[in-house]
Amino acid sequence: MTSNYQEIKTPKAVTTESDKKISDGYLEIHRYRISHEKYDGNQTPILCREVMDRGSVGAVIPFDPIRQELILIEQFRIGAWAAGWPQPWLLECVAGIVEEGETAEEVVCREAQEEAGCEILQLEPIAKYFSTPGACTELVSLFCGRIDSTGLGGIHGLETEHEDI
């Protein structure tokens, strides 16, 4: 049996003309002027793109295998509000930013305590993915965390981070 599939080489070359930090507030944003190789071997013209430098995030889906329950958190998200979403309090996985010197595993165990009041008993990696690669550097390490969900609930979050979860 023959295939009509034509193998196409994935482009690899990117040329940076400039990288300018345009915001260093709550979020760091860079404006890049780049060109990149195309599938046909030619280069794109210079493209101007803004990118939010977010870094790495650890996220966990707390799961109680005995009770067959997943734990999600709910919190206000300004992006949903700014987009006009009718209910900007969103259901989410437990997650947090991986700071220098931390691992994603350490982050999700800490955040599970802070955001949901639960202890992760065992972690299983699920995937690593970019959340919004068209405009953000955020790389998410997603885990399933075995927990005992007995008695969980309530309001959580750190006062110092203005969390209301």
Map each language-model feature to its residues.
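Alpha-helical and coiled-coil interaction segments, frequently adjacent to or embedded
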Residues: 2-13, 23-26
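A short coil-to-beta-strand element that immediately follows conserved catalytic motifs
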Residues: 15, 119-126
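Acidic pyrophosphate-coordinating catalytic loop
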Residues: 20-25, 41, 83, 129-140
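Acidic, metal-coordinating catalytic segment for phosphate/diphosphate chemistry
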Residues: 22-67, 81
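Conserved hydrophobic/aromatic beta-strand scaffold that supports enzyme active sites
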Residues: 29-31, 72, 142-144
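Active-site-adjacent beta-strand/loop module that shapes the phosphate/pyrophosphate-binding cleft
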Residues: 34-38, 132-153
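Conserved Nudix-box catalytic region and its N-terminal flanking loop in Nudix hydrolases
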Residues: 49-52, 61, 69-110, 152-161
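Extended, acidic-biased charged interface segments
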Residues: 105-118, 122, 145
